[in-house]
UniProtKB/Swiss-Prot annotation:
Gene: mntP
Protein name per UniProt: Putative manganese efflux pump MntP
Compartment(s): Cell membrane
Regions that span the bilayer: 4-24, 43-63, 67-87, 107-127, 131-151, 165-185
Native organism: Methanocorpusculum labreanum (strain ATCC 43576 / DSM 4855 / Z)
Record flagged with keyword Transmembrane: yes
Listed Pfam families: Mntp
Gene Ontology CC, one term: plasma membrane
C-alpha cells in the first residue's frame, strides 16, 4: 500500500506539471476574480486528471489506436495557438491575454493537459493495477498545483507586468513543443 501511495504521488506530481504551467500562464493574464478563477481552474484540471486515468483503465488499449493518429496534433496545435495568442497580445497591447474564466477554454486546456493521465490509466489496466486511489491522488494534486499556479501567475504578473504574459505564452508553446517531440515526431 505504501508503494502504491508513493508511486501515485510521484506520478501525480509529474502529471500536474502541465496543469501548473497552464495555470501559471493563465493567472498571469488575470485582472480580477483571482481566487474564484483559481478554484475553477483547479476543479477543471483536477477533475480531468482524476477522470482520465479511470477512463484509460476502463477502456484499456483500444483507445490508443483512436488517439494516436491525430489526438496529439490537436493538443500541439492548441498549445501553439493559445501560447502564440498570449505572446501576440502582450505586444499588441491587448490586456485580455488567455482567459481561464471561460469554461470552453478551461475544458480544452484541461483535456489537453490530461492526455498523459489517460495513458497512465491504460498502463494501470495493462499491469492489472487498481486505479481508483491513484486517480484520486492525481486529481487532488492537479487541483492544488492548478489552484496555486493561477495565484502564482497573477502575483508574478503584478511584479513583472506584461513580461509575465510573454513568459506564460512561451511556457505554453514549450509545452506544445514537448508534446510534439514526445508524441508526434
Amino acid at each position: 500500500m505504501t508503494d502504491l501511495l508513493l508511486s501515485s504521488l510521484v506520478i501525480a506530481v509529474g502529471l500536474a506539471m502541465d496543469s501548473f504551467s497552464v495555470s501559471l500562464a493563465g493567472g498571469a493574464a488575470l485582472k480580477d476574480n483571482i481566487v474564484k478563477t483559481a478554484v475553477t481552474a483547479g476543479i477543471f484540471f483536477g477533475f480531468f486528471q482524476f477522470a482520465m486515468p479511470l477512463l484509460g483503465w476502463g477502456i484499456g488499449v483500444p483507445i490508443t489506436q483512436v488517439i494516436d493518429p491525430f489526438g496529439y496534433w490537436i493538443v500541439v496545435g492548441l498549445f501553439f495557438f493559445i501560447g502564440g495568442k498570449m505572446i501576440w497580445d502582450s505586444f499588441s497591447g491587448d490586456e485580455e491575454g488567455i482567459s481561464l474564466i471561460g469554461w470552453k477554454v478551461l475544458l480544452l486546456l484541461a483535456v489537453a493537459t490530461s492526455i498523459d493521465a489517460l495513458a497512465v490509466g491504460i498502463s494501470f489496466a495493462l499491469i492489472g493495477e487498481a486505479v481508483l486511489l491513484p486517480a484520486v491522488i492525481i486529481g487532488v494534486v492537479a487541483f492544488l498545483f492548478s489552484f496555486f499556479g493561477v495565484l502564482a501567475g497573477h502575483k508574478l504578473s503584478s511584479i513583472l507586468g506584461n513580461k509575465m504574459q510573454i513568459l506564460g505564452g512561451v511556457i505554453l508553446v514549450l509545452i506544445g513543443i514537448k508534446f510534439l517531440i514526445e508524441y508526434c515526431l
